[in-house]
Structures are given as C-alpha cells and as structure tokens.
C-alpha cells in the first residue's frame, strides 16, 4: 500500500523531457505569432503609405485646379490641409513623414513640361520599396522612379526603372531589381501629370 502511494507521488508532474517539449512548442508558437504580426504590420504600413500618396495627390489636384502650373508646391502647402493625417505632420520641421519613418516630399517640375509635380517616399526598406514601386496610379501618373535623384529636373521618361524614370508602371521584377538598398534608404517617386 505504501509503495502504491509512493509510485503515484512520483508520477505527478512533468518530466524534464516533457517540460522541454512544452517550452519548445511555446517558443515555436511565439515565433509564428511574431512573424505574422511583423508581416501584418508591414502590410498595414504599406497600405497607409498608399493612402497618404492618394490623399496628397487628391489635395494637390484640388488646390491647383485651374492653375497653369504647380509653381510653389511643397510640403508646407499640404501641411495646412486636412489631406495628410495629423500623425504624419511634422509641423516643427515643416515636413510630412511616411509610415516607414521617412518623408513624403512633393514639388513641381523645374521649368519643363515632362510632368506636373512629383511625390517621393523616402527611407523605405526593400520590401516596402517593392510594394510601393509597383503601385499603378493609372492615367494620373506620367511616370515612376526608384532611387533616382533630382526628381524635379527629370525631362524624359524611358522604358526601364533601373536608375531612370519610367513612363509606365513598374513591374514586380523591375522593382525587386531597382529596390537594391537593404538598409532602408530606398525611395520611390511618382511623377504626376
């Protein structure tokens, strides 16, 4: 009788191997949750950036309707509208931020008629760059660019997104090649009519 009680006493609880298996399972579940959370967070940031671009475009088009040019267009004009959500307005530095921690820069074309104005999203990681570079703005867009400089001085649009402005929407394959910076220094530019 005493031995039965002792055996039951020793059978209670988990063995070391069982405890290790439970901890391993918990770690796997936690890692999976973190992975999917990060993926959902990145997707949400991309959607917010797209909404920000669309809102800025709509506001600019509304403000400049009937005007002959976009002369004087810059971020401070958009800061004074309701088109940009307050959490992306840096009124102290007169900048518009984007969901990835960079900026949304806007400006007119410099004395050329290749396009009307541009919008550039900066400090994008590779995944965000690919996602945002493939955004097709339809007939409102004159061209697209990835990691190009001197946006306001572009005078023509080519057929490739590699180091140049492109006249048509950027394909995912082109974006994967053009978004080459792995240190969150990519930028995507939309050239609007």
From Swiss-Prot:
Subcellular location: Fimbrium; Membrane
Positions carrying N-methylleucine: 14
The entry's keywords: Disulfide bond, Fimbrium, Membrane, Methylation, Plasmid, Transmembrane, Transmembrane helix
GO cellular component terms, A-Z: membrane; pilus
Disulfide links within the chain: 129-179
KO phenotype (gene knockout): Deletion mutants cause significantly less diarrhea in volonteers.
Residue ranges annotated as propeptide in the record: 1-13
InterPro entries recorded: Bundlin (IPR007971), N_methyl_site (IPR012902), Pilin-like (IPR045584)
Membrane topology, record value: Single-pass membrane protein
Subunit structure: 10 to 100 laterally aligned filaments or bundle-forming pili coalesce into rope-like bundles. These form linkages between the bacteria within the enteropathogenic E.coli (EPEC) microcolonies that are attached to epithelial cells.
Family of the protein in this entry: Belongs to the N-Me-Phe pilin family.
Function field: Major component of type IV bundle-forming pili (BFP) that plays a role in adherence to host cells and virulence.
Protein name: Major structural subunit of bundle-forming pilus
Organism expressing this protein natively: Escherichia coli O127:H6 (strain E2348/69 / EPEC)
């Amino acid at each position: 009788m005493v031995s039965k009680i002792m055996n039951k006493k020793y059978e209670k609880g988990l063995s070391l191997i069982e405890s290790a298996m439970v901890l391993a399972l918990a770690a796997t579940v936690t890692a999976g949750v973190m992975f999917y959370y990060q993926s959902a967070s990145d997707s949400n940031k991309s959607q917010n950036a797209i909404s920000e671009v669309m809102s800025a475009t709509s506001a600019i088009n509304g403000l400049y309707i009937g005007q002959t040019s976009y002369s004087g267009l810059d971020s401070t004009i958009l800061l004074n509208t309701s088109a940009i959500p307050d959490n992306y307005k840096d009124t102290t530095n007169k900048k518009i931020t984007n969901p990835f921690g960079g900026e949304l820069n806007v400006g007119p074309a410099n004395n050329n008629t290749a396009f009307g104005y541009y919008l550039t999203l900066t400090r994008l990681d590779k995944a965000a760059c690919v996602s945002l570079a493939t955004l097709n703005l339809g007939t409102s867009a004159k061209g697209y660019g990835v990691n190009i400089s001197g946006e306001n001085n572009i005078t023509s649009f080519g057929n490739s997104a590699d180091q140049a402005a492109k006249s048509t929407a950027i394909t995912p394959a082109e974006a994967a090649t053009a978004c080459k910076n792995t240190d969150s220094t990519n930028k995507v530019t939309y050239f609007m009519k």
